Curated annotation (Swiss-Prot):
GO terms for molecular function: calcium ion binding; Notch binding; receptor ligand activity. It is found in: Cell membrane. Changing residue 65 to A: Strongly decreased binding to Notch1. GO terms for cellular component: plasma membrane. Keywords: Cell membrane, Developmental protein, Disulfide bond, EGF-like domain, Glycoprotein, Membrane, Repeat, Signal, Transmembrane, Transmembrane helix. The record marks 111, 217 as: Interaction with Notch1. It is a single-pass type I membrane protein. InterPro entries: DSL, EGF-like_Ca-bd_dom, EGF-like_CS, EGF-like_dom, EGF-type_Asp/Asn_hydroxyl_site, Growth_fac_rcpt_cys_sf, NOTCH_homolog, Notch_ligand_N. Residues 1-27 form the signal peptide. Disulfide bonds join 51-55, 62-75, 176-185, 189-201, 209-218, 223-234, 227-240, 242-251, 254-265, 260-271, 273-282, 289-301, 295-311, 313-322, 329-340, 334-349, 351-360, 367-378, 372-389, 391-400, 407-418, 412-427, 429-438, 445-456, 450-465, 467-476, 485-496, 490-507, 509-518. Residues 186-188, 192-196 are annotated as: Interaction with Notch1. This is Delta-like protein 4. The gene is Dll4.
Length: 686
């Protein structure tokens, strides 16, 4: 058996097993009769005779469909006999097995109708106790007939029947066979606990699912409480198995993309980055300052791209991370040439002669002493007790003795070098940084370090190049010589590139050349198919000539009868031409007539008059132009008068003479025939 047929059989069995518990069966049940006591005090038979030595009694039971009047016939619902149960009067005990079983069982295999007829007969046998019904000489003691209705149920219905000789006490009921339920024992249900279903049967035959199962046929397990309906499933109760892409005890957590570092997902295989992270796998730190706090001593950290940052140091600190503490005297706090002495937590200024104060800021000189240097202007104050110098640009100090150094505030970030340019300053940045203060990080790939079309990747330790086929080296600067391009397979100055394998190459052709090796020029147009075009044109011309010849032949054939008629007309005498009948006085009758015409010796002057559909009644009385009265004796007859003509079949006594003309313009081709009885003249269109 093929795998397909085995699968089909498996599904067929599954369908049969699922539908089997609910099918409507024919029914199956048992009519039970319990005999309790029989009394025959006198030991008499039904015929009035006594039993000798006593009535050895057995019973015959016949169960059949309901009959208003019980009649003899087959026991349609079943029958049963008992062994000898006693003599004359006796009590019948219940017995569940062996001979003499009580209650008596009458099984049936149909839907219980609810009504019945029951015949109970008591018999006396002189023969065998175990099979008395087969013994000869059995005699009837008594019989009772019960007709009525009985519903299926476990309760017994008791009754007692008495007559003049006997008394019988009994009870009966109808119960369904195993696996059959309902009011008529027609509902089949078999409890089961397997992969086809997990249920028990209710008293009415309906299914009652076992704990943990649900569905019409109790074949669907109840999953763990809270298990996601779409993302989880179960094959047995209290279980939660996750579908691909989901995880967690309740299958409500999606699985992110493999390699996702700092991201989450809302659908499987997604990587949505957390705040401060970027990249395909959320592994690029966009908020390095927050995650790592690289700046020390209270300095301010500023993010400048993936893994990039800048530390702005507080006064007294320096370094890339502001990790270096400056000397207290580094800011030159002492003025007017005072010397600074650095202590652990402070400093001290040693003032030169003529100055005093914490920073030597006070002078004992006056403007008269010309204390201002480098062109500074002195201004008296405090009533001559002190002075102030107004310094020119690029100089500072209480006496304008210091040249302004614009780099003292360390304005250049990321280790940049500050250059003092007089009234301004510039920052010389380290490689990888730019900006006025070297605050911007430059991608290592911005300089396009990869040669020959290599792809640059900006990594933490520097750029990395992915080289195209045919090149290698850190910057893709080395051409691989052991490849298909080494032999120079490309022509006409084309550039050769190694393919994906060493034996493959691709030629990049210059303008004007094509082909796998650029060996074909494209300047010349392809040759025109003159032979094919010429042959096609010749066939068309030949066909046109044949058509023209056929048309000409047809025209010649059509014109030949007209030429013959014109020739005959030209041969007529003037008298014959003048006596032609105009076409306006002829009428076509659409009747076929056959005339016998005598055309004399000149047969060309008369056309055939046979089979022409003409009205021969308009010619009489016509007098042609130039004709003489009396030449035609009957010419004075009315045009409307109809004179019958003799047809060929009438065998006229005369022969008809006709004059024919094919004139095209004023006259039609006609034959003029005399209307006289003997001459039979008539005009007809030819």
């Amino acid at each position: 058996m093929t795998p397909g047929s085995r699968s089909a059989c498996r599904w067929a069995l599954l369908l049969l097993a699922v539908l089997w518990p609910q099918q409507r069966a024919a029914g199956s049940g048992i009519f039970q009769l319990r005999l309790q006591e029989f009394a025959n005090e006198r030991g008499m038979l039904a015929n009035g005779r006594p039993c000798e030595p006593g009535c050895r009694t057995f019973f015959r039971i016949c169960l059949k469909h309901y009959q208003a009047t019980f009649s003899e016939g087959p026991c349609t619902f079943g029958n049963v006999s008992t062994p000898v149960l006693g003599t004359n009067s006796f009590v019948i005990r219940d017995k569940n097995s062996g001979s003499g079983r009580n209650p008596l069982q009458l099984p049936f295999n149909f839907t219980w109708p609810g009504t019945f007829s029951l015949n109970i007969q008591a018999w006396h046998t002189p023969g065998d106790d175990l099979r008395p019904e087969t013994s000869p000489g059995n005699s009837l003691i008594s019989q009772i007939i019960i007709q009525g209705s009985l519903a299926v149920g476990k309760n017994w219905k008791s009754d007692e029947q008495n007559n003049t000789l006997t008394r019988l006490r009994y009870s009966y009921r109808v119960v369904c066979s195993d696996n059959y339920y309902g009011d008529s024992c027609s509902r089949l249900c078999k409890k089961r606990d397997d992969h086809f279903g997990h249920y028990e049967c209710q008293p009415d035959g309906s299914l009652s699912c076992l704990p943990g199962w649900t569905g019409k046929y109790c074949d669907q397990p109840i999953c763990l409480s809270g298990c996601h309906e779409q993302n989880g499933y179960c094959s047995k109760p209290d279980e939660c198995n996750c579908r691909p892409g989901w995880q967690g005890p309740l299958c409500n957590e999606c699985i992110p993309h493999n390699g996702c570092r700092h991201g989450t997902c809302t659908i499987p295989w997604q990587c949505a980055c957390d705040e401060g992270w970027g990249g395909l796998f959320c592994d690029q730190d966009l908020n390095y300052c927050t995650h790592h706090s690289p700046c020390k001593n209270g300095s301010t950290c500023s993010n400048s791209g993936p893994r990039g940052y800048t530390c702005t140091c507080l006064p007294g600190y320096t370094g890339e991370h502001c990790e270096l503490e400056l000397s207290k005297c580094a800011s030159n706090p002492c003025r007017n040439g005072g010397s600074c002495k650095d202590h652990e937590n402070s400093y001290h200024c040693l003032c030169p002669p003529g100055y005093y104060g914490q920073h030597c800021e006070h002078s004992t000189l006056t403007c008269a002493d010309s204390p201002c240097f480098n062109g500074g202007s002195c201004r008296e104050r405090n009533q001559g007790a002190s002075y102030a110098c107004e310094c020119p640009p690029n100089f500072t100090g209480s006496n304008c003795e210091k040249k302004v150094d614009r780099c003292t505030s360390n304005p250049c970030a990321n280790g940049g070098q500050c250059l003092n340019r007089g009234p301004s300053r510039t920052c010389r940045c380290r490689p990888g940084f730019t900006g006025t203060h070297c605050e911007l990080h430059i991608s290592d790939c911005a300089r396009s370090p990869c040669a020959h079309g290599g792809t640059c990747h900006d990594l933490e330790n520097g750029p990395v190049c992915t080289c195209p086929a045919g090149f290698s080296g850190r910057r893709c600067e080395v051409r691989i010589t052991n490849d298909a391009c080494a032999s120079g397979p490309c022509f006409n100055g084309a550039t050769c590139y190694t393919g994906l394998s060493p034996n493959n190459f691709v030629c990049n052709c210059p303008y004007g050349f094509v082909g796998s090796r650029c060996e074909f020029p494209v300047g010349l147009p392809p040759s025109f198919p003159w032979v094919a075009v010429s042959l096609g044109v010749g066939l068309v011309v030949l066909l046109v000539l044949l058509v023209m010849v056929a048309v000409a032949v047809r025209q010649l054939r059509l014109r030949r009868p007209d030429d013959d008629s014109r020739e005959a007309m030209n041969n007529l005498s003037d008298f014959q031409k003048d006596n032609l009948i105009p076409a306006a006085q002829l009428k076509n009758t659409n009747q076929k007539k056959e005339l016998e015409v005598d055309c004399g010796l000149d047969k060309s002057n008369c056309g055939k008059l046979q089979n022409h559909t003409l009205d021969y009644n308009l010619a009489p009385g016509f007098l042609g132009r130039g004709s003489t009265p009396g030449k035609y004796p009957h010419s004075d007859k009315s045009l409307g008068e109809k004179v019958p003509l003799r047809l060929h079949s009438e065998k006229p006594a005369c022969r008809i003479s006709a004059i024919c003309s094919p004139r095209d313009s004023m006259y039609q081709s006609v034959c003029l025939i005399s209307e006289e009885r003997n001459e039979c003249v008539i005009a007809t269109e030819v």
